Amino acid sequence: MAQGNIKVMGAQNNQVVEQYMTQAKAFVYAACEDFGIALVEAQACGTPVIAYGGGGALETVIDIRQDQDQGTGIFFFPQTHQALAETVETFSRFQHQIRPESCRNQAAKFTPKVFETSYLAFLEQCYQDFTKTVR
């Protein structure tokens, strides 16, 4: 099934996942989810992402072809194995432009603390808007 450069490992603890993720050339994600925490976790390890360009990936990954300075990965379209294979080839031409620190900086935008701060600011704004209409 898997070739010599692919290792199917099954469930692993966080330490093993982090070790492999940090050493990976890229994290491939072909699913379409609303958020997809695995994309953020890969970037937190400094690992570029090759992802289907739909769903939450569009918010969490920056395509290197769109932003040469802050790119954190590359998208493929449509969601087919042919498009994925072509994008893996394309990634090989761009991979050295993607900096681990850019990946980590992008992941830092999705920490629980950032979410909490944003959510509280949103609630405060809603409250302020509400109190203006009540008076």
Model-identified regions with their sequence ranges:
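Nucleotide-activated donor-binding/catalytic signature segment of Leloir-type glycosyltransferases, i.e.
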Residues: 1-15
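Short alpha-helical segment that forms part of, or immediately flanks, the ligand-binding pocket
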Residues: 18, 40-44, 58-59
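Short glycine/acidic-rich beta->alpha loop that forms part of the nucleotide-sugar donor binding site
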Residues: 34-37, 43, 53
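Short hydrophobic beta-strand element within catalytic cores of glycosyltransferases
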Residues: 48-51, 58-61
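Conserved acidic donor-binding segment of nucleotide-sugar-dependent glycosyltransferases
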Residues: 63-81, 90-96
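A charged, aromatic-enriched C-terminal amphipathic alpha-helix characteristic of glycosyltransferases
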Residues: 79, 96-132
